[in-house]
Design a protein with these regions (language model features):
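Basic nucleic-acid-binding interfaces
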Residues: 1-153
C-alpha cells in the first residue's frame, strides 16, 4: 500500500480572522533612495519611520519590523489583508512618504528636489512573501540591518 500523507500544521496564533476569511499574509519589502545618497538618518529617519507607520494604519496593514539598511535601503516586514495588493502597498508607502519627507525635511530639497525628475525613491522595489517558518528569520535579518551598517563604519 502506497499512501501519500500530507500533514499541515497551522499555528492559529498567527492567523488573522476577517469577516469572510482567515489569513496570514506577510511580506518582506525593500526599496531604496534613487540617487543612493545617505540621507535616511537623524530627523529624516525619524520622520520616515513615523510616516510609514501612519500610512500602514491609514490603509489597514501592519508593519511588524522596520529598519534602515546600509545604502539607505528600507526593510519592512508587513502583514496585510488579502484584499490589499503589494503594488498598492508599495505605491502608498513610497508616494506618501516622499511627499511627507520633502515637506518636513528641508535638507532633502537640495539633494533631491532640484533634480529634473524630483524623485526620492528608486522606481524599483523587492518583495518576498514570507511563510510562518521564515517570518522569524526575516525579522532577525531586518533587525540586523542597522547592526551591519554600524559594524562597517
Amino acid at each position: 500500500m502506497n499512501a501519500n500523507i500530507c500533514v499541515i500544521i497551522i499555528d492559529i496564533n498567527r492567523l488573522t480572522y476577517g469577516k469572510t476569511s482567515v489569513y496570514n499574509l506577510n511580506y518582506h519589502l525593500i526599496w531604496g533612495i534613487k540617487y543612493r545618497n545617505k540621507v535616511l538618518k537623524g530627523h529624516v529617519e525619524t520622520v520616515l519611520k513615523r510616516t510609514l507607520y501612519e500610512i500602514a494604519s491609514k490603509y489597514g496593514f501592519t508593519i511588524a519590523h522596520m529598519e534602515i539598511g546600509k545604502d539607505d535601503h528600507i526593510h519592512l516586514l508587513v502583514s496585510a489583508l488579502p484584499e490589499l495588493s503589494v503594488t498598492n502597498i508599495m505605491r502608498w508607502l513610497k508616494e506618501i512618504s516622499a511627499w511627507q519627507l520633502f515637506r518636513e525635511c528641508p535638507e532633502l530639497q537640495t539633494s533631491h528636489r532640484k533634480k529634473p525628475d524630483r524623485h526620492l525613491w528608486s522606481p524599483s522595489y523587492y518583495v518576498e512573501s514570507i511563510g510562518t517558518v521564515n517570518e522569524q528569520a526575516v525579522a532577525r535579518y531586518i533587525d540586523d540591518q542597522r547592526r551591519k551598517e554600524v559594524n562597517l563604519e
